[in-house]
């Protein structure tokens, strides 16, 4: 396909009127990325132009192309010049990105599409309003689902996963990653790294992680699951709502902050007789439970403890 050359204003008009109705915040992020990478200047009235290729794509990306507009499923190998890839709104496309340490910005359209990153760049992907699937690669990527019920998977780098609005599924990869569900009833899952941060946001969320992770439920009736026997320490914050914390581990020194609402901590395979000592700290409004196998759990703002032999109600301090 022929290459055209577009100023920032012409690119913005193209995104408005040529089947690429990318929301304003994503358009702004795209332009900022192109300015940061030196394609455009951030000075007012900048008339510099970017090399732009649009239409069906196949084969190697021409060396001079800086922005690629795709209209069908394809594989793209990144180059130092390629800075952005744009989807149209038709949906049903899969983009596979391969290559080295070249950073690329990907803006998906309104349809339900898939992006798979196999490269080593620190890429940025913005989903559209469809139900998108995004998979991270080997770099430190930023993956945003946007509206819709999205599925986002982290890669091997230190990625940021943001579901946006909708009922999303976020799964951490092997790096130290940040998972944020956004609004909606989301599922956040990390069973590999133990160095991730899981933030539910608004909605009734499910946060599944391992020892060493940090959990924050946000608003809504959230459910937390903590696995692993590494002995690493986790902090779990419920936020507003009636939250339930399931500790599926017998090691470590964990801290659970229930927040507003009626909250419950469930101790897997533990009876109340496994608790050998309880410390009460009225200054911090907390209870510290000591178990016979050296596990300790600090709880505050929690109303109930569930054991195999019954529930214990904790009075407010």
What would you call each of these model-derived segments?
Residues 57-59:
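Surface-exposed, low-complexity/disordered Ser/Thr/Gly/Pro/Asn-rich loops and linkers
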Residues 78, 87-89, 97-99, 107-108, ...:
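Glycine-centered beta-turn/loop sites at beta-strand termini
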Residues 112, 122, 131, 140, ...:
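Consensus positions within tandem repeat domains that build extended binding/scaffold surfaces
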């Amino acid at each position: 396909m022929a290459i055209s050359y577009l100023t920032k204003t012409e690119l913005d008009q193209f995104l408005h009127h040529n089947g690429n109705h990318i929301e304003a915040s994503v358009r702004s992020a795209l332009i900022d990325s192109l300015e940061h990478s030196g394609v455009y200047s951030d000075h007012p009235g900048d008339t510099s132009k970017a090399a732009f290729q649009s239409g069906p794509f196949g084969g190697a990306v021409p060396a001079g192309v800086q922005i690629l507009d795709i209209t069908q499923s394809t594989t793209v190998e990144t180059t130092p010049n390629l800075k952005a890839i744009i989807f149209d709104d038709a949906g049903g496309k899969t983009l596979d990105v391969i290559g080295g340490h070249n950073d690329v910005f990907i803006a998906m359209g309104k349809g339900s599409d898939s992006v798979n990153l196999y490269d080593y760049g620190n890429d940025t992907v913005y989903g559209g309003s469809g139900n998108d699937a995004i998979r991270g690669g080997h770099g430190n990527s930023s993956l945003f689902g946007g509206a819709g019920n999205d599925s986002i998977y982290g890669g091997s780098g230190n990625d940021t996963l943001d579901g946006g609005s909708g009922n999303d599924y976020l799964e951490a990869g092997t790096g130290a990653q940040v998972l944020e569900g956004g609004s909606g009833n989301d599922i956040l899952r990390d069973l590999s790294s133990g160095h991730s941060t899981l933030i539910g946001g608004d909605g009734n969320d499910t946060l599944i992680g391992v020892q060493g992770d940090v959990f924050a439920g946000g608003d809504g009736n959230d459910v937390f699951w903590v696995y692993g026997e590494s002995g690493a320490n986790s902090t779990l914050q419920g936020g507003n709502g009636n939250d339930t914390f399931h500790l599926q581990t017998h090691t470590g020194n964990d801290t659970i902050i229930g927040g507003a609402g009626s909250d419950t901590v469930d101790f897997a395979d533990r009876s109340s007789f496994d608790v050998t000592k309880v410390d009460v700290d009225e200054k911090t409004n907390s209870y510290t439970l000591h178990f016979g196998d050296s596990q300790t759990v600090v709880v505050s703002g929690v109303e109930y403890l569930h054991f195999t032999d019954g529930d214990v109600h904790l009075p407010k301090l």
